[in-house]
Amino acid sequence: MKHFAAAALAALLALPGTASAQLAGEPFIHDPSTIMESDGKYYTFGTRGGGLVSEDGWTWHSGGERPGGGLAPDVIKIGDRYYVAYAVGGGGMNGGHASNIKMMWTKSLDPKSRDFGFHDVGVVASTDGVENADAIDPAFLLVDGRLWLSYGTYYGFIRIVELDPKTGTRLAGNQPVDIAIDMEATALMHRDGWYYLLGTHGTCCDGPNSSYNIRVGRSKSLTGPYLDNMGVPLLKGGGKLVIDGRGREFGPGHFGLIDLGGGMEKFSMHYEADMDRSGRSVLAIQPLLWRDGWPLAGENLKAGTYEIKSERSGNALQLNVDFTRIPFDVRKSFFAPAGAPIVSLPDQTLAEDQATWPKDKVAVDLGEYMIRPHQQWTITPVPNAGGYFGSPYYKIVVAGTDRALAATRDDEVVTAPSFTGAPEQLWRIDQLTDGSYRITPKVKSASRRDVALVAIGASTPTLATFDPANDSGRWTFKAP
């Protein structure tokens, strides 16, 4: 399983969108493990050893060391140890399904750290090549102080065993329990009294011809039975869709939970093929939503022009400028004669609306959306500005202009006459678990707090600490 604790990523508060779901750098990997923070960097490991490393969660490069090779590792941090599980053999490699899942641990994932160094724990699960199971694709879940490991592939059952969280060894006498079929690359989650088993269906390892997709079932008991949304047992091949291919990226698999806290969750995975990167397998990070008790993939915000609507009041973010009327004879509305011709009125133009705007900084407020130019915002990723967990930084400008939304040092928000690329003009936009978004400036406030765009009442936006318990810091983006 792939679960990332909130505390480990507190500094990275994520943003969704980009013109593409692609991460920056060289995020080439197959079967990525849980993303882990260690010594200020972020690591994920893949099949055959090695993996990827990132300093900001957005730009990834080859790095990290994982001895042992093998298939589809997973990582979990318990106390001061990082436990790593990986499979040796199986998976149909060389025609067989005999396999061992091995465990090791280290106190750092950074090869330059004095705490780096793997210690072998031994085999924690195995299959003999004859039984109806294949011990590969391990995944961890730590819940209520107990450590569990799921594993298996299409060849037979998905199984779960219990490990000792203090040593990483298999609990004495513990026997595997069969919990699903027709999936592989499983992951486990626990939320609101439910256990969720996610697994990858479809075919893999053939680039753009791969049909991998991620599905889920749930149970009140960790050992099952797991059912999908239609009541079909996962032991009979059931599974509710979480995500399939999107755009020019095919075959999502190997789900990994990233719980950032504050109503924000994401997940890592790989796409079997990114058509814009030679069809290679790549790391990807998506928002995770929850609807009616079920997880589903969110959408990274795409570059475009939007109305930015406050979930608190329903009002739209806008420049605080004088209202310019659209020329209109009211008598034509109330007293038009029968049979009068019907014509389409033009939208107000930017030039008409802009004529009375101040030339320097302009404040922003909230108002009823009336399709005015000063209520429309163009959002685009900023090249070479870096990023954060899963996304680049964005600029937010009044559509058709270079007037940019900016944070001030005293926790207010204004628009600057032009976009300069300064940190106060760079923004993160995180999709939350309910589908709304949080908007956060890159720059720290004078108090060094992490602040977000928040609505005070119906008409005043400001920067303040985000409170997931209410709607004041939640926003939606709608195409005009």
Locate each region found by the language model.
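Bacterial N-terminal signal peptides
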Residues: 7-16
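Carbohydrate-active catalytic/glycan-binding domains of CAZyme proteins
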Residues: 20-329, 373-384, 423-428, 433-436, ...
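Lectin-like carbohydrate-binding module/patch detector with strong preference for beta-trefoil
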Residues: 303-480
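Positively charged n-region of N-terminal signal peptides that target proteins for export
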Residues: 1-4
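Residue-level detector of transmembrane insertion/anchoring sites
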Residues: 6-7, 71
